[in-house]
Amino acid sequence: MSFDINWSELVSDESLNESIKEFLDNQFQSISLPSFIDNLSVSDFSLGNSPPEITIRHIGDPFDDFYEDEGDDDEKERKNVYMQQGVSEDTNSSDDDEDDEYDGDRSNDLSIITEDPNIHTFTSEADRSRLASPPRPPLTDLRRSRASSDPFSLIMGNNNLNYMHNYNMNYVGLGNLNATGTHTGTDTPTNILNQNPYATLKSNPSSYYKNKDPSKFSGSDTHKNGFRLTSKEPCSTRGENDIQLIAEVKYNGDLHLELTVNLLVNYPSPNFISLPIKLHVTDLVIHSIITIAYLKNSVFFSFLCDVNDINSDYFTSSTQNSTPEHMGATNTGGNFVDYVSGPINRERIDIIKKVKIESEIGEAEQNALRNVGKVERFLVEQLRNIIRDEFAWPSWVCFDLNEDDDDESDDQEEN
């Protein structure tokens, strides 16, 4: 079975590029800038003409998080507190029986996908890392929905990673786990699909419910081409046509992002000199596992984890975090500099593995400043953070396809 995606028709719609540009600009406007730059904005964006390579790895039912609403969350959180304070053994036994019955009903929902005959099993310690630090606050009110569980409690069973092989995975909040549960960054967790989405909840109930403050999910981005980005509550009931894809996406295309910012010289007085900088972000490299779910005329999208390319410089020990590949070369205006994510980020999903930046400082014919590496590294890291926080699990973005129906209803009411 195959799907044909008309990429040229998708990118020919300028409203889509404009919507993404406005979204990124709003995100950059919301971050705290260091003292040496100001007036940061996104001046241009283009998806480019090169489509990503998409390989479907699994087709099944959507994650339960896409169906949960705020009322259910409040009830579950109250139940979770009750469980943490101590519930009688009889009550716990009853709950376990109910969960076991549910697990049996879903035991055949997920198929086995084997890429390598060498099967490895690794123990997850997702809850330990998540409970150690508080969740990061949203960048803006445009924060999309967030799942209640750790990234793979929905697709891991019995606290083991099962049924997908031959992939180095960088799990959100987990890092790379070996058989003893330690973070090494080099061992290869090889499986991500499971048969028991509640295994982590049963063994560590406090890890399942996380921040679901509805005030964080306000806002909506409307597209002119018939859909809109929305932060509406997930569907509360399952439909017979609901479906979810787990896919591997590999992108190394000609996406272009243009940023403008002023570089400040604060000596001998604050803002003594202001130099305009134009940064062209190109050659974006992404290799990740994603989920795409269709629920009642809405499409949910989220990055689940990175795929670690064995032959890539992304996970070599010599690679430094967000540093130019050619450290000896002087970064002058108009030069291209590559930035790659290094081993320090192995504990989290990065999504952006590599990116190239061309800097223009002052007038194009003049070398106004010889070193803008600090500005470039700051912007690259912020771009990674924005995409990771907004699109990586446990966050997701929802494309609401009901806009045409809403417009028709409004027209009928006016007539």
From Swiss-Prot:
Biological-process GO terms, alphabetical: mitochondrial genome maintenance; mitochondrion-endoplasmic reticulum membrane tethering; phospholipid transport; protein insertion into mitochondrial outer membrane
UniProt keyword annotations, A-Z: Endoplasmic reticulum, Lipid transport, Lipid-binding, Membrane, Mitochondrion, Mitochondrion outer membrane, Transport
Compartment(s) of residence: Mitochondrion outer membrane; Endoplasmic reticulum membrane
Main subcellular localisation: mitochondrion
Residue ranges annotated for the SMP-LTD domain, each copy included: 1-402
Sample GO molecular function, one term: lipid binding
Region (Disordered): 53-146
GO cellular component, one term: endoplasmic reticulum membrane
Signal peptide interval: none
Segments of skewed composition (Acidic residues): 62-75, 92-103
Topological category with respect to the lipid bilayer: Peripheral membrane protein
Assembly and oligomerization: Component of the ER-mitochondria encounter structure (ERMES) or MDM complex, composed of MMM1, MDM10, MDM12 and MDM34. A MMM1 homodimer associates with one molecule of MDM12 on each side in a pairwise head-to-tail manner, and the SMP-LTD domains of MMM1 and MDM12 generate a continuous hydrophobic tunnel for phospholipid trafficking.
Similarity-based family: Belongs to the MDM12 family.
HAMAP family noted in UniProt: Mdm12
Domain remark in the UniProt entry: The SMP-LTD domain is a barrel-like domain that can bind various types of glycerophospholipids in its interior and mediate their transfer between two adjacent bilayers.
Record protein name field: Mitochondrial distribution and morphology protein 12
Gene from which this protein is expressed: MDM12
